[in-house]
Amino acid sequence: MTLHHVRRGTGRPLLLLHGLGGSWRSWSTVLDALAAEREVIAPDLPGFGATPPLAGEVSIATLADAVTAFLDEHGLRGVDAVGSSMGARLVLELARRGVVGAVVSLDPGGFWQGWEQVFFYDTVASSYHLVRALQPVMPALTGTAVGRAALFAQFSARPWAVPADVALTEMRTFAAGPSFIPLLRSLVHGPTQQGAPAGPRGATPGPITIGWGRHDRVCVPRQAARALATFPGARLYWFERSGHFPQWDTPEETVQLVLRSTG
């Protein structure tokens, strides 16, 4: 599977998988720091950024198939992997399948129950349609702290502090991905995430670290316990000052966690 991607740095490879509506640029706040220590491979997942959508079903399973094919194409099977949001669930699925090494899963989606599931779908779908409608004025909105505070209130603990260029890029990509709505529906209404088979470390090839923002308003913190129940060999790390995207709110802490957990 051909995925548009960037490769930076030298050293042991490290795969970065973005979230729903993102692209490789979603890692821009931590990319250079990670590339100073590792060779970073950051693809655009199918239907986002510069990678065309899949021909058929769009789901965690089919995205995992596509990423596995990409890893095989580039000789990267067994690579350490970091994921954010939907990408965080994706790296857990890849670990369950045994195709990646050490994993850092940042605020993974998919561990909601009851009202949380409805809340996730309704708020994210509403954000998508609003962002699409606001595209003509998006440069002005993302160019001010007040505008960023309004746009990113659900996603960041410090939305006004998200860099203006990062905010604009995210809002452009968020609105443009043809796979956004099909994947959102699949995430909410599709199969729940399976855990790893029983065994050492949950029978995954490498250790799993699940990072969660204490102020996550997308995947609320109570969901962390369910993620750990699904992957009982995982270690939980709390970002005390972060929302849904620790790479935005606490980039230095995120880099330290990734390097420490995959080293």
Residue ranges and their predicted role:
Residues 61-79:
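Conserved acidic catalytic loop of the alpha/beta-hydrolase fold
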Residues 96, 100-136:
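Flexible "cap/lid" loop of the alpha/beta hydrolase fold
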Residues 239-255:
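Catalytic histidine-centered segment of alpha/beta-hydrolase-like enzymes
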Residues 83, 87, 91:
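Gly/Ala-rich beta-loop-alpha elbow adjacent to hydrolase catalytic centers
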Residues 204, 210-212:
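Short beta-strand/loop motif that positions the catalytic acidic residue
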Residues 6-52:
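Conserved HGGG/HGGXW glycine-rich cap/lid loop of the alpha/beta-hydrolase fold
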Residues 214-219:
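Acidic catalytic loop of the alpha/beta-hydrolase fold
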Residues 139-203:
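Conserved alpha/beta-hydrolase catalytic His-Asp/Glu region
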